[in-house]
Amino acid sequence: MKRIIYAISLGVLLAIPVLSQAIDTTPMIRVTNVHNGQSDESLDTFTETKFFGPYQFRVLKDAIETQGETKDIDGRVFRTSDGVFMHVKARSIDGNSMSLDNEIKNLVKERTIPEPTVKMVLPIKDSVIEVNNDGVRSLLAEFMYGWPLKNRTDMVLVTDYEGTRYYDKLQFYRDRLPNGVRIEQLREMIMDAQFSYK
């Protein structure tokens, strides 16, 4: 009887480290970004969560993942029939990389110069919002374009996290929003980009 009890005790002692390792290897923890004290729970009804490396982001449920749309995209690209376009990409940062603020300044500067192939593509408004996602600092640059793209809005969320810089971009046309989706919800969608970690 003592041998049986000893064997069971030994088995439990050996199993505990294995179980703890199994728990440790589950890296995904869902966190929800609350921007300005608000969280839109209805996002779950028309969006779904995707993962890109350790990055967690939202796309519209009817979005189809596409490839090769533009040369500068090296991440994942999604497009809906409503004209909503979203892509996520990540790149490593070296020690000489510019700060997050300077990255945004360059982004704003680049987008206020007309594209060579399109006339008069100038933002009529651009703004930068700081977003704090569970202690991780992100900057959201939003652009509303003038003629001929007067109804287009682009949003780019840029984040540094553990040595990697992440870009989350959403582009849509305000006269062709997805059915039942408000512009504020699309904005919340990109700001809800989160990290799954630990």
Predicted regions and their residues:
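N-terminal targeting sequences that direct proteins away from the cytosol to non-cytosolic compartments
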Residues: 6-7, 11, 15, 19-85, ...
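Short, conserved charged micro-motifs
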Residues: 97-102
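Acidic/proline- and glycine-rich, intrinsically disordered low-complexity segments
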Residues: 78, 104-111
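Signature of long, low-cysteine stretches enriched in small and polar/charged residues
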Residues: 109-161
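Positively charged n-region of N-terminal signal peptides that target proteins for export
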Residues: 1-4
